[in-house]
Amino acid sequence: MLVPAPFLLVLLLLLGAPQVGLSQRSPKAGSSPSCLHTALREAEKSQRKDTSLLIKRTFPALPRGDPEDQEGQEEEDTEKRTFPGSVGGGGGGGAGSTRYKYPSQAQFQGRPSQDKAKSDRRTKVTLSLDVPTNIMNILFNIAKAKNLRAKAAANAHLMAQIGRKK
């Protein structure tokens, strides 16, 4: 769990600050809060900088500006995630493209012509959670291939030993 830096500084102030009593007077009592205030401002600046970098790198869909701009950004994000589909209905051609089903040409023949918005929806494929699954399948296939190569090498070694004994 990550705790914000200003919270940690305030906690440090409350728990670790020296107690000023009757017998204990600090000659620089006025400078200590100003130092802490400066440190707190620096921590807030660095935190804003870090969070803005995180937002830019890992969370492009988070709202950053005015509510009016969010609608345009959502449309741009949707356009970035969609790809024109192939004419044959296969989609992106990847391993998960069989999950996207399009109506056959026979179904289109009986219907009247549809407006452009509906036909555009059928020709675009939207990325979903299939992408990480496809990547995992590729990694599993690579691991299986390495395992098979290792077994084949071990079998070849055994066959060579058997051939020497005869």
UniProtKB/Swiss-Prot annotation:
Name any GO cellular component annotation: extracellular space
Residue spans making up a coiled coil are none
Which residue intervals make up region (Disordered)? Answer: 41-123
**Keyword Secreted found:** yes
Enumerate composition-biased segments (Basic and acidic residues): 41-51, 113-123
UniProt subcellular location: Secreted
Q: What is this protein called?
A: Urocortin-3
> What is the source species?
Bos taurus
